[in-house]
UniProtKB/Swiss-Prot annotation:
Its EC number is 1.-.-.-. SUPFAM superfamilies: FMN-dependent nitroreductase-like (SSF55469). The keyword Nucleus does not apply. PANTHER family: IODOTYROSINE DEIODINASE 1, NADPH NITROREDUCTASE. Belongs to the nitroreductase family. It comes from Methanothermobacter thermautotrophicus (strain ATCC 29096 / DSM 1053 / JCM 10044 / NBRC 100330 / Delta H) (Methanobacterium thermoautotrophicum). InterPro entries: Nitroreductase, Nitroreductase-like, Nitroreductase/BluB. This is Putative NADH dehydrogenase/NAD(P)H nitroreductase. GO terms for molecular function: oxidoreductase activity. It holds the Pfam family Nitroreductase.
Amino acid sequence: MKLLWTSQHIKVTVHIDGKVSKMDVLEAIKTRRSIRKYQDREVPEELIDKILDAAMCGPSAVDERPWHFIVVRNREMLEKIPEVHPYGAMVKDAPVAIIVCCDSSLEKIPGFWVQDCSIASQNILLAAHSLGLGAVWTGVYPLEDRVEGIRRLFSIPEHVIPFSVIPLGYPAENPGTRDLFDPDRIHLEKW
């Protein structure tokens, strides 16, 4: 069995034949935080490939897999994102951003692409965290001004909807973890 990668941040070892020797997914979920400050350090292409592989491993309605991803490393383009996204200031300091998009021509069940792209976005965040990177989800859809701004900036065709922009890089901050479990939000059997 040939080793593909190992994470030092969560207990994950993946081998080329697809077998996982150990994994602590709950730790990744509970310790992932939104990271908005990044070190001035490039993210290797192989890590981006692993992150995108994880994004595409998410479930999707009737397996339509409507997602497309734009990987942005060009500094000039990264610095333009906050001009069309009011909450995208952190993108200017990130070495890379991934724009998650939906190709509406791939839709089999109208509207379910939002769930599919949400899952892909969450997988990007978790995969980045597991690889020692920090990331933050900045929403684009459903706000039309953001959708049109990102579409225009990246020459995205009309049938493709930009869903989220996820800047990522090596963290330059550690916001710590916190317990978000709230039993008051749980209802048994009925509301």
